[in-house]
């Protein structure tokens, strides 16, 4: 009995345990389903909210696109309207100028007709004078007979008396006629000259740009400023030393400034920095390598520019060295006016003027493009650009009219041809235009050039750069000719000569740099 009771208890316990397990498992499964359903609901809610946000952003983007499109269309319409307005204004001005020229031409034709009528009247007057002369001879004969008969004079004495009175009257009449015809000729020549100049200025419209003293280089990011400066300023010192240009790194975001009065140096330095920034390797040895390569490229570019100018202007054969000097003039300025732009303008105006006056247009154009060729050599050789231009054109056997134009446009020689006169007139037109030249800038540039010339004239000087707006001159001395002790003496001599020969505000710092380099290769 006890055994069965124990067995029953065990079975009952097992049944209870199994029941509890099944019930627990069912409860756990129910809770899991609830959690899963809740997670699904949350996921759907999140997905729905994300779709709402995405749709909202899509709507905002579309609205922004529509707004930008409307602004772009409005701006295009405004620009088109301004363009149409300016075009109409230019057409009106051109029509007015054309009308003025027609009026001037009609006036000239009218004056020519009046002159022709005057010539006819003069011929008639001459016929009447001949008739009066015959009558005079007849009366003279009768008077001589009377005088010789009644005044007891010889025929020769009476003739001398009459001729002396007649000579005085004729001299006065001759002087009056000379003054009158001189005035008529002067007025006619002045009107004709004004007509020719009006024709030239209306038929040629050249570009003009005032040269600045700085170049601005845009950088991709401000981090490059530190790399351009380099460790302890080595990179920027190398740049300034080899190029002779001030490199200004200030707080202006994304840009640096190059300052120099010499357009050629500034252009080389600008291209050098642009290539270094593009390459990414900025260090002293790399700077020197890129600088030399850019310098060679610039020389080749100047030769190509000269070739293109000669071809475009149809000047025929010209010596390669003269073409190179023409290309070099792109990097020269006079009174703030670009030398090459000025020469091209003079050449085109001179050709038009020479054509109006019956001269050789091609020869006038050639003389005009070469009239300031000496300015391409003044910074290296010094002296007058007229003397240098005459010397180089004589050396390369240019036409005598070209050499005469170089001398005559500054009054060194009399004008000897129509083409030379056309060049002188065109030079005056180009230079005398309001705003074309700036005297103060030219005086500053001349002082900078004089500072460099004084330093370059000293023995042992390899190169000299006037920097910091003329407040410092940096002199590169040859190590094989100048010792450390002589460097001090050289700096003092340059400073003393600058003090005695130039006028300048403040003071000028003279820095003499002497560097010795030894290069050897390990093989």
UniProtKB/Swiss-Prot annotation:
<dbReference type="GO" id="GO:0006402">
    <property type="term" value="P:mRNA catabolic process"/>
</dbReference>
<keyword id="KW-0378">Hydrolase</keyword>
<dbReference type="InterPro" id="IPR017705">
    <property type="entry name" value="Ribonuclease_Y"/>
</dbReference>
<dbReference type="GO" id="GO:0003723">
    <property type="term" value="F:RNA binding"/>
</dbReference>
<protein>
    <recommendedName>
        <fullName>Ribonuclease Y</fullName>
        <ecNumber>3.1.-.-</ecNumber>
    </recommendedName>
</protein>
<keyword id="KW-0472">Membrane</keyword>
<keyword id="KW-1003">Cell membrane</keyword>
<dbReference type="InterPro" id="IPR022711">
    <property type="entry name" value="RNase_Y_N"/>
</dbReference>
<keyword id="KW-0694">RNA-binding</keyword>
<keyword id="KW-1133">Transmembrane helix</keyword>
<dbReference type="InterPro" id="IPR036612">
    <property type="entry name" value="KH_dom_type_1_sf"/>
</dbReference>
<comment type="function">
    <text>Endoribonuclease that initiates mRNA decay.</text>
</comment>
<keyword id="KW-0540">Nuclease</keyword>
<dbReference type="Pfam" id="PF00013">
    <property type="entry name" value="KH_1"/>
</dbReference>
<feature type="domain" description="HD">
    <location>
        <begin position="339"/>
        <end position="432"/>
    </location>
</feature>
<keyword id="KW-0255">Endonuclease</keyword>
<dbReference type="InterPro" id="IPR003607">
    <property type="entry name" value="HD/PDEase_dom"/>
</dbReference>
<dbReference type="InterPro" id="IPR006675">
    <property type="entry name" value="HDIG_dom"/>
</dbReference>
<keyword id="KW-0812">Transmembrane</keyword>
<dbReference type="Pfam" id="PF12072">
    <property type="entry name" value="RNase_Y_N"/>
</dbReference>
<dbReference type="InterPro" id="IPR006674">
    <property type="entry name" value="HD_domain"/>
</dbReference>
<dbReference type="Pfam" id="PF01966">
    <property type="entry name" value="HD"/>
</dbReference>
<dbReference type="GO" id="GO:0005886">
    <property type="term" value="C:plasma membrane"/>
</dbReference>
<feature type="transmembrane region" description="Helical">
    <location>
        <begin position="3"/>
        <end position="23"/>
    </location>
</feature>
<dbReference type="InterPro" id="IPR004088">
    <property type="entry name" value="KH_dom_type_1"/>
</dbReference>
<dbReference type="GO" id="GO:0004521">
    <property type="term" value="F:RNA endonuclease activity"/>
</dbReference>
<dbReference type="InterPro" id="IPR004087">
    <property type="entry name" value="KH_dom"/>
</dbReference>
<feature type="domain" description="KH">
    <location>
        <begin position="213"/>
        <end position="279"/>
    </location>
</feature>
<comment type="similarity">
    <text>Belongs to the RNase Y family.</text>
</comment>
């Amino acid at each position: 009995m006890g055994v069965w009771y124990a067995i029953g208890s065990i079975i009952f316990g097992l049944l209870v345990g199994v029941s509890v397990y099944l019930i627990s498992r069912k409860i756990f499964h129910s809770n899991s389903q609830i959690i899963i359903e809740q997670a699904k609901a949350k996921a759907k809610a999140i997905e729905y909210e994300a779709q709402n946000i995405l749709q909202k952003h899509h709507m905002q983007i579309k609205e922004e696109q529509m707004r930008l499109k409307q602004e772009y269309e409005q701006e295009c319409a405004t620009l088109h309207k301004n363009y149409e307005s300016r075009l109409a204004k230019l057409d009106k001005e051109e029509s007015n100028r054309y009308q003025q020229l027609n009026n001037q031409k009609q006036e000239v034709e009218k004056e020519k007709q009046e002159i022709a009528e005057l010539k006819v009247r003069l011929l008639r007057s001459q016929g009447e004078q001949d008739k009066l002369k015959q009558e005079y001879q007849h009366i003279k004969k009768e008077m001589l007979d009377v005088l010789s008969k009644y005044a007891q004079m010889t025929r020769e004495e009476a003739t001398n008396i009459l001729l002396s009175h007649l000579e005085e009257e004729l001299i006065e009449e001759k002087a009056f006629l000379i003054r009158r015809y001189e005035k008529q000729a002067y007025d006619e020549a002045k009107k004709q000259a004004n007509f020719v100049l009006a024709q030239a200025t209306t038929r040629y419209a050249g570009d003009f740009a005032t040269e600045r003293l700085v170049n601005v280089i845009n950088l991709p990011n401000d981090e490059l400023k530190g790399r351009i400066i380099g460790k302890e300023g080595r990179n920027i010192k190398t740049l300034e030393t080899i190029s002779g240009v001030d490199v200004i790194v200030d707080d202006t975001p994304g840009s640096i400034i190059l300052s120099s009065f010499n357009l050629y140096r500034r252009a080389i330095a600008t291209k050098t920095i642009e290539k270094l920034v593009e390459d990414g390797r900025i260090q002293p040895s790399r700077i020197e390598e890129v600088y030399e390569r850019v310098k060679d490229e610039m020389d080749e570019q100047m030769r190509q520019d000269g070739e293109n100018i000669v071809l475009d202007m149809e000047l025929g054969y010209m010596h390669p060295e003269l073409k190179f000097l023409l290309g070099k003039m792109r990097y020269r300025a006079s009174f703030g006016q670009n030398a090459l732009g000025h020469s091209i303008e003079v050449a085109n105006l001179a050709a038009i003027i020479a054509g109006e006056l019956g001269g050789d247009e091609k020869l006038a154009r050639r003389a005009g493009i070469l009239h300031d060729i000496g300015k391409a050599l003044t910074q290296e050789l010094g002296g007058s650009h007229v003397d240098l231009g005459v010397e180089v054109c004589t050396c390369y056997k240019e036409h005598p009219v070209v050499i005469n134009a170089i001398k005559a446009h500054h009054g060194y020689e009399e004008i000897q041809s129509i083409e030379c006169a056309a060049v002188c007139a065109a030079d005056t037109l180009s230079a005398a235009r309001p705003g074309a030249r700036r005297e103060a800038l030219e005086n500053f540039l001349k002082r900078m050039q004089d500072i460099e010339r004084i330093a370059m004239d000293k023995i042992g000087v390899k190169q000299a750069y006037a920097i910091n707006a003329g407040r410092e001159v940096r002199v590169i001395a040859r190590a094989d000719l100048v010792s450390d002790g002589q460097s001090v003496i050289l700096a003092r001599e340059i400073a003393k000569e600058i003090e005695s020969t130039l006028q300048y505000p403040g003071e000028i710092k003279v820095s003499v740099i002497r560097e010795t380099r030894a290069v050897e290769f390990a093989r």
